[in-house]
Amino acid sequence: MKKITSFTIDHTKLNPGIYVSRKDTFENVIFTTIDIRIKAPNIEPIIENAAIHTIEHIGATLLRNNEVWTEKIVYFGPMGCRTGFYLIIFGDYESKDLVDLVSWLFSEIVNFSEPIPGASDKECGNYKEHNLDMAKYESSKYLQILNNIKEENLKYP
């Protein structure tokens, strides 16, 4: 079997940051998959389930309600390894093009004070597993990287 793109990245050298994971074209429409890497893989502790679940709910809701980006958002969700998220958007983008959006998103999560969107038994298959405080904590740590973003945080090793 052919190895998928994300398995060709040397995770031992991967820093937290924002990376273009892949670009796909379907019927002349480009989709860009963004790797929002919050943790250094296999070095830092992974994001706990309740925190990553909360970031997913708040993040997906905020992105789909962002006036500028709402029509471009296809998907926002966690990586199985729990070191970050994937964001799939319509359009041809580079990592640097997404710094402002991702910074805005995680800043909004840090300051989020409303009930967690979609956190009821009718809306979510695991509604009891949320942790807003840890979601804010993980988001604030990631913002420190975003606020001092360097080339090494924007290009895969």
Curated annotation (Swiss-Prot):
It catalyses: S-(5-deoxy-D-ribos-5-yl)-L-homocysteine = (S)-4,5-dihydroxypentane-2,3-dione + L-homocysteine. Keywords: Autoinducer synthesis, Iron, Lyase, Metal-binding, Quorum sensing. The keyword Cytoplasm does not apply. InterPro entries: LuxS_sf, Metalloenz_LuxS/M16, S-ribosylhomocysteinase. GO terms for biological process: quorum sensing. Binds 1 Fe cation per subunit. Disulfide bonds: none annotated. It comes from the Bacteria. It is an enzyme of class 4 (lyase). Homodimer. PANTHER family: S-RIBOSYLHOMOCYSTEINE LYASE. Belongs to the LuxS family. This is S-ribosylhomocysteine lyase. The lineage of its organism: Bacteria, Pseudomonadati, Spirochaetota, Spirochaetia, Spirochaetales.
